[in-house]
């Protein structure tokens, strides 16, 4: 589908009432409803927002108040997470089911009411219950406040590029069947760009996303990895990309032929249409440098110069190989914060509390499973059990018996985390255990991958905060040597960090946002297996530094 993106973008801004003097409240209605969709020769009903796949883009400006009424018309419980929005003191609007809210039940509505404070750039929203985010997701575009230009050349046009996955089967049915077996769910059947798999898949010529471009212009692409289980390379045939933002934080610009995004991450790039007029494939394919199966198929969209006929065959880009670890490490090493007077990198230099979390897979007994066991995942050997009452409500109202606050700062036993694969004694502890944090504590957290069953990369997302990725490495983290190599000047600031396969990532943040904040692997299969936990950040000393009261329409469990 071809679109005049500049016209559409300007139309949306006008429709939403943007102007330099009048940009305060943006209101949206999200109707969660079923719609029949056909992809790669298969038709099925899917859960959507407003009948759109992907769902509608939320546009706002830095400083706006956003009010989104979500009405659930489907058989499943629903909740929506606004991925990357900090929700200061307002976890009630964060969205993860049974963490900050009870889900929205069939026939009910919930008003997500939040402020966009101190943030601008590309984020996204998605369902945060079951595997419904397979089809329930969309972009969030936060424009700079009036009078604050981009810290890079003004683009001629902007376009959203949302990378996703498609299953021919009903996803929830497939997941339930896998859980009964105690096995992983099936891989997706295709990747998508803006819901379309592109012409390399059968029955997909008309399901191809197209950008019609003018020669000699600069385009801003807002790229989002909304896939459930795949890290993805992205590139454009014949064109370089200049990275200018990650996870809605400006970066020092650098040019590359391909980018890498883990699930949950966003990247903004500038693309100059300075090649000979032609049709060029934009493509995405998986990165996997561990012995784990992935949907190793390439999704394509088209960058088409104006005046070039549709009969011209597009040119394919040369993306990195699926196991190109060196590219991944080199690419991530180039990501750095701007750290300018207007956009400082406020890295905590003094650390109040150091945490060391091991990430691993396991096998637990499962009497109801066909094989008698099921796969599990854990942090510090604890597999998280979802509560039946929202954790934030239990914390706010002092409801006992819902969770414990004794999540350990370190694993129960030290071992050679990334040595030979460990395949015995793989049982994990289970529980709803949280880590209690005093307000304004500065935290350094090292996330260490382990070779329990297998090593694997893990995109970890922290709700309620951005953090600085001060260091990464391959192998076991060395607390005596590795901190000396930390970047404390201009490290990348993110909300989702990729922990390297068989390696570690160190992050720092200041716990100045009171509430209950979820942290989990953004590979949906690992989250389902329990690779998650939460922080309970205590209130500050004044009401202005404390959790706001819950809204009147707060859902009940």
From Swiss-Prot:
- Give the cofactor binding note: Binds 4 Cu cations per monomer.
On the tree of life, the source organism's domain of life is Eukaryota
Documented EC number(s) = 1.10.3.2
Q: Which UniProt keywords apply?
A: Apoplast, Copper, Glycoprotein, Lignin degradation, Metal-binding, Oxidoreductase, Repeat, Secreted, Signal
Q: Name the positions where Cu cation 2 binds.
A: 83, 126, 522
Subcellular location as annotated: Secreted, Extracellular space, Apoplast
Q: Which SUPFAM superfamilies match?
A: Cupredoxins
**Catalytic activity from the UniProt record:** 4 hydroquinone + O2 = 4 benzosemiquinone + 2 H2O
Q: Which protein are we looking at?
A: Laccase-11
Species the sequence originates in? Arabidopsis thaliana (Mouse-ear cress)
């Amino acid at each position: 589908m071809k679109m005049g993106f500049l016209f559409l973008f300007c139309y949306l801004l006008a429709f939403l009432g943007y102007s330099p003097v009048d940009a305060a409240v943006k209101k949206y209605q999200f109707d969660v409803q079923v719609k029949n969709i056909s992809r790669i020769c298969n038709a099925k009903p899917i859960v959507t927002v407003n009948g759109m796949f992907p769902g509608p883009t939320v546009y706002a400006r830095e400083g706006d108040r956003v009010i989104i009424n979500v009405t659930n018309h489907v058989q499943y419980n629903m909740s929506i997470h606004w991925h990357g929005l900090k929700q200061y003191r307002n976890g009630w609007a964060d969205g993860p089911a049974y963490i900050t809210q009870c889900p929205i039940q069939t026939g009910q509505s919930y008003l997500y009411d939040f402020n966009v404070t101190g943030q601008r750039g590309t984020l996204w929203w998605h369902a945060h219950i079951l595997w419904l985010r397979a089809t329930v997701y969309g972009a969030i575009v936060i424009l700079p406040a009036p009078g604050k230009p981009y810290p890079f050349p003004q683009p001629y046009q902007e376009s959203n590029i949302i990378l996703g996955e498609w299953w021919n089967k009903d996803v929830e049915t497939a997941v339930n069947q896998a859980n009964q077996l105690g096995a992983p769910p099936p891989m997706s059947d295709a990747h998508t760009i803006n819901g379309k798999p592109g012409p390399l898949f059968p029955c997909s010529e008309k399901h191809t996303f197209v950008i019609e471009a003018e020669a000699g212009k600069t385009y801003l692409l807002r790229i989002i990895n909304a896939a459930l289980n795949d890290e993805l390379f992205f590139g454009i045939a014949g064109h370089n990309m200049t990275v200018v933002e990650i996870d809605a934080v400006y970066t020092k610009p650098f040019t590359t032929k391909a980018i890498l995004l883990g699930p949950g991450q966003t990247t903004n790039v500038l693309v100059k249409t300075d090649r000979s007029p032609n049709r060029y494939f934009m493509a995405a394919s998986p990165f996997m440098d561990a012995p784990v199966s992935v949907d190793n198929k390439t999704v394509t969209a088209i960058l088409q110069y104006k005046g070039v006929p549709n009969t011209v065959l597009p040119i394919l880009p040369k993306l990195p190989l699926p196991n190109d670890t060196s590219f991944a490490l080199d690419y991530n090493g180039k990501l750095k914060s701007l750290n300018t007077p207007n956009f400082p990198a406020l890295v905590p230099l003094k650390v109040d509390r150091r945490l060391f979390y091991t990430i691993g897979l396991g096998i637990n007994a499962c009497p109801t499973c066909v094989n008698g066991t099921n796969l599990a995942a854990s942090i510090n050997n604890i597999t998280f059990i979802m509560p039946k009452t929202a954790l934030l409500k239990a914390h706010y109202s002092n409801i006992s018996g819902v969770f414990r606050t004794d999540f350990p700062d370190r694993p129960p036993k030290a071992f050679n985390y990334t040595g030979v694969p460990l395949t015995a004694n793989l049982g994990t502890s289970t529980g709803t255990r949280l880590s209690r944090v005093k307000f304004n504590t500065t935290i350094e957290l090292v996330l260490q991958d382990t070779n329990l069953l297998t090593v694997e990369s893990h995109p970890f997302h922290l709700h309620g905060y951005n953090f600085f990725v001060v260091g990464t490495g391959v192998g076991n983290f060395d607390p005596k040597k590795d901190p000396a190599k930390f970047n404390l000047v201009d490290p990348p600031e993110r909300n989702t960090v990729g922990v390297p396969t068989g390696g570690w990532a160190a992050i720092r943040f200041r716990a100045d946002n009171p509430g209950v904040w979820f942290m989990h692997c953004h590979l949906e299969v690992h989250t389902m297996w329990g690779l998650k936990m939460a922080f309970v950040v205590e209130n500050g000393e004044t009401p202005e530094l404390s959790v706001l009261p819950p809204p009147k329409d707060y859902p009940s469990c």
